[in-house]
Amino acid sequence: MSLPAPTAENRAVVTGASSGIGTALAEELARRGYSTILVARRGDLLNELAQRLTEQYGVTAEVRAIDLSDREQRAPLAAELAERDIAILCNNAGVATFGPVAELDPDFERAIMELNAVAVHDLTLAVLPGMIARRGGGILITGSAAGNMPIPNNATYAASKAFTNSFSESLRGELTGKGVHVTLLAPGPVRTDNPDQDEVGTKIPDFIWVTAAYTAKLSLDALARNKMRVVPGLISKGMSVAGQYAPRALTAPIVGSFYKKLGG
């Protein structure tokens, strides 16, 4: 079965829509005719994006400016989505830290787990019954190539993405024959307009990066085909292969030394 066609009533939800892959997903969905619900903390950026999508593509773009790492803010959104006709859910919001986990802020590390893993679980479970009942829907989960292997100096992020990677591909197996597509996006470095990338960008060769727009189009095309996993970019493909076949005791110190440099 194909994904539900866009209608006046249904919506495509994008979390982390204020920047990067999230913004690109929202733009690509609007280009394909979907009205959206845009979710992120920065309401000013969401409002600018919503206005642009409406003006350029004639779609409705709703804004939900909330912190998905906060359970009290997340719960009303999950309740709302459970009652709405959600055609597509893009669980994209995520954040990372670099450095030895014992030296990082425990509260922020916990927030990473809430945002990268628990929020993905909560929002997916909110929309899933409706999608199954309608026998149609698509769930795109942004995991990471980092979730395929142990990564010292990126421990919390890698662990959170190991959850999303496994959850996405396990869920896809459960939904066979139910009309609901599930695709895992496992990207490596993605070039955006975010100035926070400047320092990281100097340590990663230009040829390794892919653009957010390319990633978004590739991901939504893969979701339409109900592809299990989409892996854009050379480094993410290499990390996927290494995570499956290389001895973990060998890859961990090699990858960890690189991530140590990212942590300064």
Residue ranges and their predicted role:
Residues 92-97:
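Conserved NAD(P)H cofactor-binding loop of Rossmann-fold oxidoreductase domains
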Residues 100-101, 108-111:
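Substrate-binding pocket helix/loop in short-chain dehydrogenase/reductase
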Residues 32-49:
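Conserved glycine-rich Rossmann-like NAD(P)H-binding loop of the short-chain dehydrogenase/reductase
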